[in-house]
Amino acid sequence: MEEKKYLKWYNKIGYGSGDVAGNVVYAFLTSFMMVYLTDSVGLAAGVVGTLIAVSKLFDGFTDIFFGSMIDKTHSKMGKAKPWMLYGYIGCAITLVCCFAIPVSFGTTAKYAWFFISYTLLNGVFYTANNIAYSALTSLITKNSKERVQMGSYRFIFAFSTSLLIQAITVGFVDKCGGDAAAWRTVAIIYAIIGLVVNTISALSVKELPEEELNEGEVKDDNEKYGMVQAFKLLVKNKYYMMICGTYILQQLYGAMIGAGIYYMTWVLKNKNLFGQFAWAVNIPLIIALIFTPTLVGKWKGMYKLNLRGYVLAVIGRALVVVAGYMGSVPLMMAFTALAALGQGPWQGDMNAVIASCSEYTYLTQGKRIDGTMYSCTSLGVKIGGGIGTAVVGWLLEFSGYIGTNATQPQSALDMMQFMYLWLPLIFDVLIMFVLSRMNVEDANKKLKAEKGIAADEVTDALDIN
């Protein structure tokens, strides 16, 4: 029996464009914040890393909090759309603040300014916006194929935006003057673009009525869960923990790739290569995303596709290490592209996997916590990205790197090589290991069989994939 379709092509594109706004924040922050702070503002990489790590302690609480708030929200716009729409206003303001540290401030005041603006951006506004955006996957359609398509559209926009930001920002900043004020100007422009696109995205989709989401019956207040109860439901779901772990590892990987700006500048002696490597990463990802929905259908699920993709990614990153020690930039780019091609399918279908994870909680616990379930996206992105950026700072500080110096010691150059060549390979191996155990689709099929639920009835009956 063919599943009911809920979305037009423009709904899918409109939804996907929301990650343009998300990556205006995320790609800009993770790729360039550290180099701005160390080389333009003159702050110590190790201290910045420590402040970021401390900020992450706050994030774990806010992810579960906002997920729980979305589950409790009832408005004319729906459950998630208000949080997505209004949360980005704060994102835009605090993004500018992160790149607008007053040069007249003393060192301590500069650290304080950064810590406050960074914590508000990640722990409050980006959290509210990103969890709501991700939760829409479960709230605007009950069709499993459409959910995979939404994920593909979303990450095509995400990686296209990441590609553009990584490719043009260095030159853009130089054209604006190359100093701290230039970074502020670029941040303002990016924030405005993100705000406009996020608004368009939020208004391009409509959440399904609660009557339809809940099998014709609106949940009463007794079905609302407190944050503590929602947290308990999450940790009982082993697949949620796996997805969180994978997200964190992905963002650690991304932070090391972002640290490539140091590797290109000091080891390869050409900072403009950072933009060229961005093409080698993002174009294959986009190509893989285009074919992900077809491959999911061909292989009758996401598990085999994701695992095989990451086997390819590990091979690609291992060859990048070899090419790096050979000193061959063309080979490094080619193998970087191979690794990215393997990573693409998981990027495209992860939201559908999370929907299956939410279904697993419903089947095992009899309770639905869609908004809170999608906290793993924001939690993983922020904790992984934040810790990754912090680790970059700590490792640079440990190696003796000083951003304002004209030359760097050999220990710093060796550390940059380790961060850019070896750590991404290690993280890919760990992700492959986790994905080998993330067969939530089969687990759900077994549970449905035990409960006597027909496979073709589940989407409509359970509101999830």
Question: Language-model segments: which ranges?
Answer:
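Membrane-embedded alpha-helical bundles of multi-pass transporters/translocases
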Residues: 2-465
